[in-house]
Design a protein with these regions (language model features):
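Short alpha-helical segment of the dimerization/phosphotransfer core of two-component systems
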Residues: 55-63
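Conserved micro-motifs of the catalytic ATP-binding
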Residues: 75-80, 120-127
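Short conserved segments within the C-terminal catalytic ATPase subdomain
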Residues: 101-116
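Short alpha-helical Gxxx[C/S/T] motif in the catalytic ATP-binding
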Residues: 218, 222
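Detector for a conserved hydrophobic position within an alpha-helical segment of the HATPase_c
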Residues: 226-227
Length: 257
C-alpha cells in the first residue's frame, strides 16, 4: 500500500522554491542563447556562453531528478535492491559528471580509490544504484552551493565493520545495523557552516538563518534516501574549522574476490 505524502505549508514553500529556481535557470539559458545568436561571429563569446548554458542545464536536470526522489520519499517503492555495481565506478562517474560544474567555481578535486587495501572486495549494495548516484550527487550540489571559490574536495572510500567497538563508541552509532558496511568519505574545505544550521541540516528541507532562506533540499534528500535503507550520514569537522567531512555509510554484502 502506498503511503500518503501530505503537503503542508513548509512543503508548499519548498515546491515554490524549486519552481522558481527552474524558471530562473530557463530564463538564464534563454538569455545566453539570444546572446550567442547576436554574437555569432565571436567564437570566444560563444564558447563562454555555451559553458554557462551547459552548467545551467546540468543543474536543471539534477534538480528535477532530486525533486522526483523527494516527492516519492514516503512511498513503498523505496525497497532494498541488490546490485553488483562497483562503488568505485559509480563515484568516479558522479565525479566526472560534476567536474565541469565544480571547476567552474575553481574547486579542486582529488580522488582516492583506496588502492592500498590489502584485500579487494566486491561490494553488493543493499541500495539501488540510482539512489546511490542521486544521494552522492545531492551532496556534491550541497557542497557546490556552500563551498567558496578556490575550495578543495577530496573523495575516498573504505570498508568498515560495525563490530569494531571503538568505531561505534567514537561515532555514537547503533550496532543493530548490518555488520558489513561501506563508508564513503567526501572531504571539502569551506568557511565555517554556522553550528545552528549544521544541527538542523537533516531535520528540515527549508531553513531560515539570519533572515536568509537556506535551501538544503539536496542534503536533506540524500539523508532520507540513505537512512531509509538502514544507512547513515553525518558531518565531521576535521583538522580545523575550515575543513568538513561527509561520512556516508551504505549497507552492503562484502564478497572476497
Amino acid at each position: 500500500m502506498k503511503k500518503v505524502f501530505y503537503i503542508n505549508d513548509k512543503l508548499k514553500s519548498l515546491l515554490s522554491n524549486i519552481i522558481y529556481e527552474i524558471q530562473n535557470y530557463n530564463s538564464t539559458i534563454m538569455k545566453y542563447t539570444e546572446n550567442i545568436q547576436n554574437n555569432i561571429d565571436n567564437p570566444n563569446y560563444i564558447k563562454d556562453n555555451k559553458a554557462t548554458i551547459l552548467r545551467q542545464s546540468f543543474l536543471i536536470d539534477k534538480t528535477m531528478k532530486l525533486f522526483y526522489d523527494f516527492s516519492d520519499i514516503n512511498s513503498n517503492n523505496l525497497i532494498l535492491n541488490k546490485t553488483s555495481e562497483d562503488i568505485n565506478k559509480i563515484i568516479e562517474g558522479i565525479t566526472k559528471d560534476f567536474e565541469d560544474l565544480l571547476l567552474s567555481k575553481r574547486i579542486k578535486i582529488k580522488f582516492n580509490n583506496n588502492e592500498n587495501e590489502e584485500v579487494k572486495y566486491n561490494y553488493i549494495t543493499l541500495l539501488d544504484k540510482s539512489k546511490i548516484e542521486n544521494s552522492i550527487s545531492n551532496i556534491f550540489l550541497f557542497i557546490y552551493n556552500m563551498a567558496k571559490v578556490n575550495s578543495f574536495v577530496e573523495i575516498s572510500y573504505s570498508s568498515i565493520d560495525y563490530n569494531d567497538e571503538e568505531f561505534l563508541f567514537n561515532n555514537g552509532l547503533k550496532n543493530n545495523l548490518i555488520n558489513n558496511n561501506l563508508l564513503i568519505e567526501i572531504i571539502f574545505e569551506s568557511q565555517n557552516i554556522p553550528e545552528e544550521l549544521e544541527l538542523k541540516l537533516f531535520k528540515t528541507p527549508l531553513l531560515t538563518y539570519n533572515e536568509n532562506s537556506f535551501n538544503n533540499l539536496y542534503l536533506y534528500t540524500a539523508y532520507n534516501i540513505i537512512v531509509k535503507h538502514s544507512g547513515d550520514i553525518w558531518i565531521d569537522a576535521i583538522e580545523n574549522r575550515n575543513k568538513k567531512k561527509f561520512n556516508i555509510i551504505l549497507p552492503i554484502n562484502k564478497n572476497y574476490e
